[in-house]
């Protein structure tokens, strides 16, 4: 009997030790990364990678990259950057849009692709968290089978929980001004996340997150508004004829997204429209449409990141949890996801009422989410214009156009820009720098430097 009792106690202790170990493993999984394969020498910035568990049992493990501000991390803003998709990895933002590293554009020869420093990183004046979300994106994963698939509203809650836990482990940043940013499909999740954080600050969560505002680039906002803007945009950019445009307006009555199936004349005109535009690279209409494996194509850089991230030495350096090891994809469109926010306009309205400042910017050569639609929903908020439409300048050259509204919202175009910040990274960096510092976009700035 005594032996049975001793055996029971011993097994219980082993189980307790095992549970404590598991708890520690999932509570503290952050790692400082000093160097990365493909980059010469130590990293010239402070990088941390890790997992934060969310959900009742912390079954969802969200992977993040955190880079401290290169200026004054104790006081500079903290920015959470969400890549669109849904299902596009945070690496897209980090290596192509606004991070301190990018791929060296050499033709792949079977060896590990190289990384080089950028001169346009937003981390020059803010700390940044690049987050792999929703679950299944990048290196984020679930330790158990999920009964509820990710959704727009569900992600807003998960991201809020992630932030609370992340700041709990990084309390030195809890008083820094906090912003949420992203582009493309993040136009749905970012406004909802801002509202969720704002509600949490008032209702449930202490200490409050020092939320100040948000920014979005070429944001998907309302499928009807965004979709209906593509035809007038195509006409304005001389992609379709005046005759076709006038016929579309008259026969389809401005409704191009949800066409009456009995309106055969409209459907026929839309077929003609698609014939004119189907061979365009929609993310930037001036770029050629070609295969990702073509070294002469813009999107070849995405192939390089695929080779780099899927290298075993890179995953080891990033401290990737073995449970999440699988083939990394820049964007995985196959994951189940519920799009339960039809329009994020009401979220913008609520965030405006609550006083949060915002920056909405549009690359003016994006055919995916044309700037025309973005201007339509901004106008629907019905706020007075504070600063009239005017050019914003870099080195005495027009970099785009901008105006501001009474709800602390700034709208800006990026001249020659595309669907994401990556097409004009120098210009978007200057734009972000001015806005985050509370300056007017049309102010003065230092000379631009070129990417190394």
UniProtKB/Swiss-Prot annotation:
Glycans are attached at residues 109, 125, 350. Its EC number is 3.4.16.-. Belongs to the peptidase S10 family. InterPro entries: AB_hydrolase_fold, Peptidase_S10. Keywords: Carboxypeptidase, Disulfide bond, Glycoprotein, Hydrolase, Protease, Secreted, Signal. This is Serine carboxypeptidase-like 6. Expressed in seedlings and roots. The active site is at residues 184, 366, 419. Disulfide bonds join 88-331, 252-266, 290-297. One of its GO terms (biological process) is proteolysis. Residues 1-29 form the signal peptide. Probable carboxypeptidase. GO terms for molecular function: serine-type carboxypeptidase activity. One of its GO terms (cellular component) is extracellular region. The keyword Membrane does not apply.
